[in-house]
């Protein structure tokens, strides 16, 4: 088996690398993080760990179980007692946890082991030195004997003069021998001292390490999140509780005896009880200390965050944030969504540092990953011209003449309700036209047309002059900083007045070149074609001055002009390409939707495969219906496009929720009257997205203080069964604008009697909704005076009390109508007639100029000169 590294082994056994290296070091193996570990070294480490913590070590915990069986007599239902068997089981666990004994024992064992090791080593060294000394002495003795024999053989005669030299040699040999023995003994003593010192240091190190490990283990047990029945503190408390429980029985038995005996025994019992209370264990005491200083954190805040999430980021309770926002003037709930600026103010107010993060990093990355290199050449493109003006001033008819097609006849009611996008080839070049609605309800649609355009052609009828939507079109053109060309239409009519048009336009900042301004004027007739060529020439001249250029090659980008849901084709979007080339098969990201282009068609319905700059095109294949005005961008990766679309949808939802600040202080009193307002519920479906937005804005604007238009559901496409069911459940009106209900929806509509209405002209829709709202208004009542009588005399009647003899001066006095009594033109009584007589005959009414007797019910203080006014309450029809 191949060797493994220390890091890999630590991962396998579930320990940190530093701890494993420390255990290797304790086992006598020096290893680093990247070193290999052999099987022999693993076995050596395992043997060491077994020796330290293995099966041979003494047990540290012992569990004892005890069972007690007793019998308890209880009273039965019939007055007889019965015996109940009671079994009590107790489990106790004894743990060996004396830290001092463990440390002392470890120190003694280490010291004894070190001394034995030093003694053995010293004995071995002494034996070796003795052996070496014996060998040296034997060798020296043999050499001396050999020398002596040789000398004796060589010298037969020994003179007395030579004896001092022999003695000197012998003394020198003995001196050398003594010096050698002393050096050997000194060396042995030094080595023994070193071994003893090394053993002492090892024992001290081991004792410190063992003490530190024991301290860490006890601290971990004390600070760890133990179960209430397994922690050391809990076990100590449980043991104390068991002891108290055993003593409680004896105390209860002795209590009655003490009461009987009284006196000293009772006092002793109370004193003993107080002593037991004073020595109660304090093992369950709380050990948390509150921080003395405020904690400042780095809070990372995205574009939106809820109150609970912000509280979690700042490690505070949500109620603290709610209190802080109440101090700042806003009431919020725990699940309310806050925008980034508000969350930043709250966090900084509470003393934290704020780090703003951008959550749309993927979106930014996807949109930047395009073929926009510096080497791509810019080419001239066709101008995008928007036709704007008041309703029925001839915008579509003028465009119709330019295109040589009957477009206006196809619009319902002869008015434009969609943005029409067309491109026209002229002799001098191509022009792309956007035809916008002129009705007041299509303000947002006209604004989108001005945003996506290069030149605005303002159509003004020569016989009608400047109208409200004309002024609005001028404002859109100025806001978009777009050049404005005025086309004065209907010049063929005899009542055409050019000077009036110029004068009215000059009041709104549009001056003709003849009057010293910089706006080009063209006088045209959409009926005869007069001046149309001059208008086209002026458009191309203005485009040449603007030097319109765009990238033709590369990934396309554009804007959604219109979108709809087709029953057979699915979501369809009309896109005006602004740069690059849009091809079939490209992956497009349109606002909240995405998809791969399955088919492309031009404005005439012909299939095409690509479209360059300034070309309007219909695309199929999106995941849903995009909103008009969304930017359309070609991206590389469909998966990333899907992620960006989902992120945008979530962000749109969060922003929508953040705007619904129902609980703000400034809205609180307005919300109190919500129950008093009547609601007209509407389920709205339209053919295209732009018309849907326009109708929604118009209907919402009809709301008053008494009646509110509530669009509970809206969408693009046919009316479905789901829409019909929702309308039936919420008592709503179903409105279809240029769409129809399918078969399943018609069944539900008939069975539930849902009010279904179809419209093709927006005027009729708004008028009928107004009429429905008028019917929901609370009726208004008005008091109308029908007669006036003057009191001429007062008579007393025993039955009726005071009777006023009156002359009718105005109108008719009716007996059934309520009256008022006026004195000096001040109302002093309001009630009803009790009797009305003429010549002692009861009558129903008395006309002007006749005398009559009037008895007022429950009122006798009628005086001469008073006036009696008769009135009736009339209901007045209300209008919006």
From Swiss-Prot:
InterPro entries listed in its UniProt record: DNA-bd_dom_put_sf, EF-G-like_DII, EFTu-like_2, IF2_assoc_dom_bac, IF2_II, IF2_N, P-loop_NTPase, Small_GTP-bd
**Is Nucleotide-binding a UniProt keyword of this protein?**
yes
Biased composition of type Basic and acidic residues is found at 143-228
Give start and end of each tr-type G domain: 380-549
Q: Which GO terms describe its molecular function?
A: GTP binding; GTPase activity; guanosine tetraphosphate binding; translation initiation factor activity
Which amino acids does the record list as binding GTP?
A: 389-396, 435-439, 489-492
Has keyword Membrane? Answer: no
Task: State its location(s).
Answer: Cytoplasm
Q: Which CDD domains match?
A: IF2_eIF5B, IF2_mtIF2_II, mtIF2_IVc
* UniProt keyword list: Cytoplasm, GTP-binding, Initiation factor, Nucleotide-binding, Protein biosynthesis
Q: Per the record, which residues fall in region G4?
A: 489-492
Q: Where is the composition biased (Basic residues)?
A: 249-262
Region (G1) spans which residues?
389-396
Residues covered by region (G3): 435-438
G2: annotated span = 414-418
Any one GO CC term of this protein is:
cytosol
Q: Where is this region: Disordered?
A: 143-289
* Principal place of residence: cytoplasm
Signal sequence bounds: none
Region G5, annotated ranges: 525-527
Recorded family membership: Belongs to the TRAFAC class translation factor GTPase superfamily. Classic translation factor GTPase family. IF-2 subfamily.
Function of the molecule: One of the essential components for the initiation of protein synthesis. Protects formylmethionyl-tRNA from spontaneous hydrolysis and promotes its binding to the 30S ribosomal subunits. Also involved in the hydrolysis of GTP during the formation of the 70S ribosomal complex.
What name does the UniProt record give this protein? Translation initiation factor IF-2
Q: Which organism is it from?
A: Shewanella sp. (strain W3-18-1)
